[in-house]
Curated annotation (Swiss-Prot):
Species this protein is from: Salmonella paratyphi C (strain RKS4594)
Chief location category: cytoplasm
Superkingdom assignment: Bacteria
Name of the protein this chain belongs to: Endoribonuclease SymE
Organism lineage string: Bacteria, Pseudomonadati, Pseudomonadota, Gammaproteobacteria, Enterobacterales
Record GO terms (molecular function): DNA binding; RNA binding; RNA endonuclease activity
Subcellular location: Cytoplasm
Coiled-coil ranges per UniProt: none
Length: 110
């Protein structure tokens, strides 16, 4: 006989039926051969409601019979100082030393 601890409890589904969408795989033509390739089009206000606003980058994970789309978090903007440092790192070693000497003078360290 089964003990009470080994009986699975009923849980709510992670995705509610109202949030389900039904699509049909269509096709797109590939130029210049005009071969048909499978295509899925997603559109609707529900995408924005789900966190997929226009311009959002999306990670796509593909498994057999399953595609998972995940909205990427926007990258924080790089500060002006970090942008300048990135530019300096592309300069020649001589120019980098000149920039370092300037920073040292401004900081009063040398």
């Amino acid at each position: 006989m089964t003990t009470p601890h080994s009986i699975a409890e009923s849980t709510d589904p992670e995705v509610f039926p109202a949030n389900n969408r039904h699509l049909t795989v269509s096709y797109a033509s590939r130029y210049p051969e005009y071969t048909r390739i499978p295509a899925i089009t997603l559109k609707g206000q529900w995408l924005e409601d789900a966190g997929f606003t226009t311009g959002t980058q999306v990670d796509v994970r593909v498994m057999n019979g399953c595609i998972v789309l995940t909205a990427q978090q926007p990258q924080p903007e790089e500060s002006e100082l970090m942008q300048s440092l990135r530019q300096v790192s592309k300069l020649s070693a001589r120019k980098q030393k000149q920039v370092q000497a300037f920073i040292d003078v401004m900081a009063g360290s040398k």
